[in-house]
């Protein structure tokens, strides 16, 4: 094989094969520059509908449209070469029927080049997952806290405590048996997440779940510390980019007002002297 041969991107079968092995690494991305950074280190790059809140300032993910997901999916695809690109199906794009879900999943895959779609829901979405998988659409499932159902759930609460644990377990079994290649467990208690991971044959990807899941996902902007006042319990900050950006912008503003920027090295001379400019 030539050393210049393109790298084969990660595929659904590769993720399935990681069950019980080295933990799977996933982060969200919404732009080309960030996608390049994520792609260098992660197995999965997720264009999450969280972009509605993170990028567009919406209060929930419910206002996210197919057009928004396609636009950001295309941008992320331009920065992705080795990780598996997964794009969220937005609220209202798949719940009506399996046929509706396939039409929109087909559009996402055709227009973004993504390798899989993610949709929220457990037992009630199993038929749709099965329908999509049978037609060549790899599906990442998402159970536990499902943000698109925030109004029905009464907020962003932990799911699966007490008697509710059986429901979440049954959701996990249902999506696995329907053919999903992995499942996100969001805000599911540690012990239950471990039991689900042991019980089902597909990889579990935790977010606010357990270190014993088969992998982890975080929202990139959260783990980079871009939002000063948003500190959910399940997010570890690996950087403080918000503070760094604030300092840089403040310094720029001060230097412009003091006429210290642009300095001589940042401007062009009226006449060429020596090297061409």
UniProtKB/Swiss-Prot annotation:
GO terms for biological process: pantothenate biosynthetic process. Pathway: Cofactor biosynthesis; (R)-pantothenate biosynthesis; (R)-pantoate from 3-methyl-2-oxobutanoate: step 1/2. Binds 1 Mg(2+) ion per subunit. Its cofactor is Mg(2+). Pfam families: Pantoate_transf. Keywords: Cytoplasm, Magnesium, Metal-binding, Pantothenate biosynthesis, Transferase. Gene3D superfamilies: Phosphoenolpyruvate-binding domains. It is found in: Cytoplasm. The active site is at 186 (proton acceptor). CDD domains: KPHMT-like. 3-methyl-2-oxobutanoate binds at residues 49-50, 88, 118. GO terms for molecular function: 3-methyl-2-oxobutanoate hydroxymethyltransferase activity; magnesium ion binding. InterPro entries: Pantoate_hydroxy_MeTrfase, Pyrv/PenolPyrv_kinase-like_dom, Pyrv_kinase-like_dom_sf. GO terms for cellular component: cytoplasm. It catalyses: 3-methyl-2-oxobutanoate + (6R)-5,10-methylene-5,6,7,8-tetrahydrofolate + H2O = 2-dehydropantoate + (6S)-5,6,7,8-tetrahydrofolate. Its EC number is 2.1.2.11. Mg(2+) binds at residues 49, 88, 120. Catalyzes the reversible reaction in which hydroxymethyl group from 5,10-methylenetetrahydrofolate is transferred onto alpha-ketoisovalerate to form ketopantoate. Belongs to the PanB family. PANTHER family: 3-METHYL-2-OXOBUTANOATE HYDROXYMETHYLTRANSFERASE. Homodecamer; pentamer of dimers. This is 3-methyl-2-oxobutanoate hydroxymethyltransferase.
């Amino acid at each position: 094989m030539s050393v210049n041969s393109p790298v084969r991107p990660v595929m659904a079968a590769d993720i399935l094969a990681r069950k019980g092995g080295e933990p799977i690494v996933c982060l969200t991305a919404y732009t080309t520059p960030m996608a390049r950074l994520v792609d260098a280190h992660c197995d999965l790059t997720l264009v999450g509908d969280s972009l509605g809140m993170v990028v567009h300032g919406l209060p929930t993910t419910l206002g996210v449209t197919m057009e928004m997901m396609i636009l950001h999916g295309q941008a992320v695809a331009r920065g992705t070469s080795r990780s598996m690109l997964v794009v969220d199906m937005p609220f209202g794009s798949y719940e009506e029927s399996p046929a509706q879900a396939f039409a929109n999943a087909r559009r996402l895959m055709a227009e973004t080049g993504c390798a899989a779609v993610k949709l929220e829901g457990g037992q009630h979405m199993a038929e749709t997952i099965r329908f999509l998988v049978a037609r060549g659409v790899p599906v990442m499932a998402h159970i536990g806290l499902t943000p698109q159902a925030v109004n029905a759930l009464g907020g962003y609460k932990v799911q699966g405590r007490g008697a509710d644990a059986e429901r979440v377990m049954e959701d996990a079994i249902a999506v696995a048996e329907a053919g999903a290649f992995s499942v996100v467990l969001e805000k599911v208690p540690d012990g239950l997440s471990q039991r689900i991971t042991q019980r089902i044959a597909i990889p579990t990807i935790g977010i606010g779940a357990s270190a014993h899941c088969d992998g982890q996902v975080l929202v990139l902007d959260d783990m980079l510390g871009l939002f000063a006042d948003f500190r959910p319990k399940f997010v570890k900050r690996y950087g403080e980019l918000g503070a760094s950006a604030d300092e840089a912008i403040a310094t720029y503003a001060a230097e412009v007002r003091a006429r210290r920027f642009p300095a001589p090295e940042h401007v062009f001379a009226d006449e060429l002297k020596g090297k061409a400019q």
